[in-house]
Swiss-Prot record:
The lineage of its organism: Bacteria, Bacillati, Cyanobacteriota, Cyanophyceae, Synechococcales. InterPro entries: Chaperonin_Cpn60_CS, Cpn60/GroEL, Cpn60/GroEL/TCP-1, GroEL-like_apical_dom_sf, GROEL-like_equatorial_sf, TCP-1-like_intermed_sf. It is found in: Cytoplasm. Residues 523-542 are annotated as: Disordered. This is Chaperonin GroEL 1.
């Protein structure tokens, strides 16, 4: 495809347009008086959101070069969201300001590479100061952080605080939709481990990139699976039962993985596979723990057990399994509670007789996973649109609270960034020329989150920042007062701020040092059938035989390659059957 190229200032200005387009839509979502963004959906009702990452992902710009800028800043939001779970709007605001200030200076003759060095030096200074100002999160502050992160919603803050208190910070907390109008907290058996799906083709929710299985059957084995021949009998039983199916194995690869993916995508099986967690003997122990939790029999080579002998009675079960690219969460049924408690007691006895401190720590980790359980936050609302909105807020708040427990908190409302901005003056004055300018770009950007929080609350951002610097107090956008934000419980997770800073400087510096922007030239839309000079009938499509499905594994009825539809009349694709045995 032909490419459109922009050079030098022209390329950077086009990229800046894309950055501004996205950032201006995103930054209305920051602070306790943030505004909502309504997003049209192709199907169903529109979404109403107050989440920077969600807004950024939905934006496409007609100009292909400007759209590159939009995608760069969307990358900032998504990367911060992925790493910290929150802080996407802060990262977007910081990036926009750095890009704007950087391009002004480049247009005035500044060297982009020197600006980049100055920005990176400024970032290193800021991160050091941020770490020194961070304080550990005490138990009473958890609800405050959760409430602030939920936009001041005290109900959400209270529910998350209760969930954290019950399952602890190491426990599993999941958010799901409820059939009722009320948002409730439910504690059940379950656990999570750090392994994701074997293939992204198992994903059931494309927007969230998550695979969810309701009431699945579970095969657990310490064997490596590279062919499905031995699994044919149990797969046939699963297909007849119509149950979702999870395979948890040492590894699943090659022909076995390919065949599962093909049958998943053709609708023959609702299946997913996950590699077993940990390594060596600890992997086997972890599989035994999961087997007890789910009521499964561990199919182990040590016991001379083979996969071709597996029956439906050897499989485990769960209420729900949620799999992301790097994590699996199991919500178990209550009928295994006694077995789990017995397993925990056995592990506690092992701790007492184990001399190795390292082994004791590993066993205690297993105890925490088994005993912690799963906290289910069931989100209730009057409408589907409100439920989606509320669920997003709870997920953001939960992620921010976990981040706060990991690395501590600092004064919120952007106050800490303003204080560090003042400290940057000393570093700036000892630097020279464009290096100093790069540091000042970071310095100015640190003021922007507070300015936007104030603006969204109906105040003048410049005036608010000046008052914060004069009074040495933070600005409470809810009350419009200047006060000690730590005493008021307005706290930001240090991890969220750190990652927002790192991601924003990274993308802004790359954009400022860009000399050429290249994008595909959009192809003109094809003329509609029956248009001027065309055949009014629009042409007849070629007729073809329906495609024949691929061959599946022997003995597996209905399993195999999906059929490929033949060519037909315009708008009428040929029907293709799934491969028959």
């Amino acid at each position: 495809m032909a490419k459109q190229l922009n050079f030098s200032n022209e390329s950077r200005e086009a990229l800046e347009k894309g950055v501004n387009f996205v950032a201006n839509a995103v930054k209305v979502t920051i602070g306790p008086k943030a505004k909502n963004v309504v997003i049209e959906k192709k199907f169903g009702s529109p979404d109403i959101v107050r989440d920077g990452s969600t807004v950024a992902k939905e934006i496409e710009i007609e100009n292909p070069i400007a759209n590159l800028g939009a995608k760069l800043i969307e990358q900032v939001a998504s990367k911060t969201k992925e790493s910290a779970g929150d802080g996407t709007t802060t990262a977007t605001i910081l990036t926009q300001k750095m890009v704007q200030e950087g391009l002004k200076n480049i247009a005035s003759g500044a060297n982009p590479m020197e600006l980049k060095k100055g920005m990176e030096a400024g970032l290193a200074f800021v991160l050091e100061k941020l770490s020194s100002k961070s304080i550990s999160l005490s138990g009473s502050d958890i609800q405050k952080v959760a409430t602030v992160s939920a936009g001041g919603d005290e109900e959400i803050g209270s529910i998350i605080s209760k969930a954290m208190d019950i399952v602890t910070s190491d426990g599993v907390i999941t958010v799901e939709e409820s059939q009722s109008l009320e948002t409730e907290l439910d504690i059940t058996e379950g656990m999570s481990f750090d392994r994701g799906y074997s293939s992204p083709y198992f994903v059931t929710d494309q927007e969230r990139q998550v695979c969810e299985l309701e009431n699945p059957k579970i095969l657990i084995t310490d064997q490596k699976i590279s062919t499905l021949v031995d699994l044919v009998p149990i797969l046939e039983e699963i297909q007849k039962a119509g149950s979702p199916f999870l395979i948890l194995a040492e590894d699943i690869e090659g022909e076995a993985l390919t065949t599962l993916v093909l049958n998943k995508n053709s609708g023959v099986l609702n299946v997913a596979s996950v590699r077993a967690p940990l390594f060596g003997e600890r992997r086997k122990a972890a599989l035994e723990d999961i087997a007890i939790l789910t009521g499964a029999k561990l199919i182990s080579e040590d016991k001379s057990m083979t996969l071709d002998k597996v029956s439906i009675n050897d499989l485990g079960k769960a209420k729900k399994i949620t799999i992301t690219k790097d994590k699996t969460t199991i919500v178990a049924f209550e009928d295994t509670k006694d077995l789990v408690e017995a397993r925990v007691e056995k592990l506690k006895r092992e701790v007492n007789i184990t001399e190795s401190e390292y082994d004791q720590d590993k066993i205690n980790e297993r105890i925490a996973k088994l005993a912690g359980g799963v906290a289910l936050i069931k989100v209730g609302a009057a409408t589907e649109t409100e439920m989606k909105y509320k669920k997003l807020r709870i997920e953001d708040s939960l992620n921010a609270t976990k981040a706060a427990i990991e690395e501590g908190v600092v004064s919120g409302g952007g106050q800490t960034l303003i204080e560090i901005s003042d400290d940057l003056l000393n570093l700036s004055e000892t630097s020279s020329d464009d290096l100093r300018t790069g540091i000042n770009i970071v310095k100015e950007a640190l003021l922007e989150p507070t300015k936007q929080i104030a603006k969204n609350a109906g105040f003048n951002g410049d005036v608010v920042v000046a008052e914060i610097q004069r009074l040495n107090k933070g600005f409470n956008a809810n009350s419009g007062q200047y006060e000690d934000l730590k005493d008021s419980g307005i706290l930001d997770p240090t991890k969220v701020i750190r990652l927002a800073l790192q991601d924003s400087v990274s993308i802004a510096a790359m954009l400022l040092t860009t000399e050429v922007a290249m994008a595909d030239i959009p192809e003109p839309e094809a003329a509609a059938p029956g248009g001027p000079g065309g055949d009014p009938m629009g042409g007849m499509g070629g007729m073809g035989m329906p495609g024949m499905g691929g061959m599946g594994m022997p003995g597996m009825g209905g399993m195999g390659m999906p059929g490929m539809g033949g060519m037909g009349m315009p708008g009428m694709g040929g029907m293709g059957m799934p491969g028959m045995m």
